[in-house]
């Protein structure tokens, strides 16, 4: 399978380690730097991802830190299960930056581009 050559920075803001199709996305978007951010400690499942060259783990505890990530990142991946964290989807929408989600992780109808979780390649090659 061909690799996508898109470059840039993506944000995933979560409070859980249940992130849909994460391994597939990391493998197939090697030129994207993924900032996985959380206001909590990372589980071992997520912690081991820091060894990947295109993953940055960030603990966020203030609105200023989140605003910095919104400004820095090119798009948001709304692919975390459970609740939306700190209204991150609306922050990206207000910043006029794209938000991509899966059908089983989308947080409300806030203008996200939604893909079937069973076909992650559609998101990757978007």
PLM region spans:
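Acidic donor-binding loop of glycosyltransferase active sites
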Residues: 71-84, 97
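Short acidic alpha-helix that forms the nucleotide-activated donor recognition element
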Residues: 62-74, 94
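Conserved catalytic-core segment of nucleotide-activated headgroup transferases in glycan assembly
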Residues: 1-48
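Short glycine-rich donor-binding/catalytic loop of glycosyltransferases
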Residues: 81, 97-108
């Amino acid at each position: 399978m061909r690799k996508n050559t898109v470059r840039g920075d993506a944000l995933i803001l979560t409070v859980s380690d249940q992130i849909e199709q994460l391994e597939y996305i990391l493998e197939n978007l090697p030129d994207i730097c993924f900032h996985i951010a959380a206001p909590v400690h990372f589980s071992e499942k997520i912690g081991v991802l820091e060894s990947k060259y295109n993953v940055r783990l960030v603990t966020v505890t203030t609105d200023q830190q989140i605003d910095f990530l919104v400004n820095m990142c090119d798009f948001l991946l709304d692919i975390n299960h459970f609740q939306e964290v700190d209204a991150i989807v609306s922050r990206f929408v207000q910043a006029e930056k794209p938000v991509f989600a899966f059908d089983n992780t989308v947080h409300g109808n806030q203008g996200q581009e939604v893909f079937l979780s069973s076909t992650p390649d559609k998101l990757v090659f978007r």
